[in-house]
Amino acid sequence: MPRPTRAATSSTRAPKALRTVATNLGGTVACCRAALEGMVEDGQGRILNVATFADLAPLPASSAYSVSKGAARIFTRALIADLSDRFPEIVITDWMPGMLRTQMGIPDGVPPEQAARWGVALALDADPALTGATFEMDREILPQRGLKARLKNLLMMRRRRPRRILP
């Protein structure tokens, strides 16, 4: 089967770009809103949004994808800001499975079966400490800290290690 092709921003028509945004951002918003109805009522739940670093390092000919996935990551952070104080048992996390070995992915990418195991394990982990965490493949991406915080942790011999997903 031929691999899907990408089109340069200059040759992509607006309706096609907007469909990509509707799928990636609109789908994330719609699914989260639908799931939250029951979660807010129960006071607990788990949201795991599938994300990417495409907003930080866009690939050529993928502007709509990069913008929409970046907006979805911002939406995840906005959800956390809206809900975490009132509903600490609703756990919200971003997960980036990596480039997959699929028709749309890359030949030497992550086997989809492995990514599925990581995704299921992370989705089933309802530890409230995971709210706001971002995982890439099977490892947490720790937030960047300023020089002052890094020095303080160094002097106090505290080293935070990224969490791992263990399927």
PLM region spans:
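A short, exposed helix-loop element centered on a Lys and neighboring polar residues
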Residues: C32-R33, R77
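Active-site loop of short-chain dehydrogenase/reductase
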Residues: M39-A51, F87-I90, A133
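Conserved mid-core segment of classical short-chain dehydrogenase/reductases
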Residues: M1-L18, A61
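Catalytic loop of short-chain dehydrogenase/reductase
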Residues: R46-A71, T76-R77, A81-D85, M96
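C-terminal helical subdomain
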Residues: I90, D94-W95, R101-N153, P162-R164
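A short helix-coil junction within the Rossmann-fold of NAD(P)-dependent oxidoreductases
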Residues: A8, A34-G43, D82-L83
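Conserved N-terminal glycine/acidic-rich loop preference
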Residues: T28, G70-T76, M104, P112, ...
